[in-house]
Amino acid sequence: MLNVLFGLIGLLVGGLLNVLADDLPRREQPSAPHCPNPECDHVYGPAGWLALGRRLQGGGRCPACGQMPRRRWAWVEGGTAVLFACLPWLIDTPITLAVYALFIAVLILIIIIDLENRLILDVVTLPMTVLALLFSLVLPGINLISALLGAVVGLVLFLMIYWVAKVTFGPGAIGQGDIKLAMLMGAMLGVPHILIALMMGIFLGGIISAVLLGARLVTRDAYLPYGQYLAIAAIVMLLWGQAITDWLLA
């Protein structure tokens, strides 16, 4: 029953993430879901706040201009619902369940915005870093010292990577938002999990970049958003971090 409840919560959270992903990169105050057509910008009523509701209303098309909805809307809502529904199977402590659900929602938001806009926004990472440090006071398995050390380690390591990439590949190889994301991940995960998460994210990004280059889907000078891989690694470490750490140290 708890899984069903969290799945429904995840569906609603996915709808909220879509709103934030649409509005925050444009520096707009988050508002009700609206048509993706900038010349229309029709605001949906309560029944259309979720992709499912819009699909039931005229096949999902905007009633004002006929614009098809973003495919991302349904994928984010469905994916967040499924992921949230699985959380009670993976986490048995109520406070950890609630806080990790928030962490994962924020990381999903970062993935969406980075994929679509090549941005990792300070308005997302900086407040969440403070919250993550505060949550470390009440979460089992981590404490404030570990969270602070994790944030510092993430910040310093990725700052070093940023400068090396800048000298080697030129400006823009790695964005400053990636540095702040690494700091946020450290505050969420603590040490030593942040080290594993960063290595995992860098490895994942390198593998996928190599595949894209090999398939000639991108060129060598193309910008590839890196934050998405770091955020995916953070989600993996939130859910299975201790098991992965124990396996690596065994």
PLM feature segments, named:
Residues 1-12, 88, 133-140, 233-250:
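Hydrophobic alpha-helical transmembrane segments
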Residues 73-80, 94-103, 214-226:
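Hydrophobic alpha-helical transmembrane segments and immediately flanking/interface helices
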Residues 176-177, 210-236:
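Interfacial loop-to-transmembrane junctions
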Residues 6, 97-206, 247-250:
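Functional transmembrane core segments of multi-pass inner-membrane proteins
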Residues 1-91, 246:
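N-terminal transmembrane signal-anchor/hairpin module of polytopic inner-membrane proteins
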Residues 76-83, 124-131, 181, 226-231:
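Core segments of transmembrane alpha-helices
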Residues 18-23, 59-67, 107-119, 160-172, ...:
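C-terminal ends of transmembrane helices
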Residues 11, 15-19, 85, 155-163, ...:
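Transmembrane alpha-helical segments of multi-pass membrane transport proteins and ion-pumping complexes
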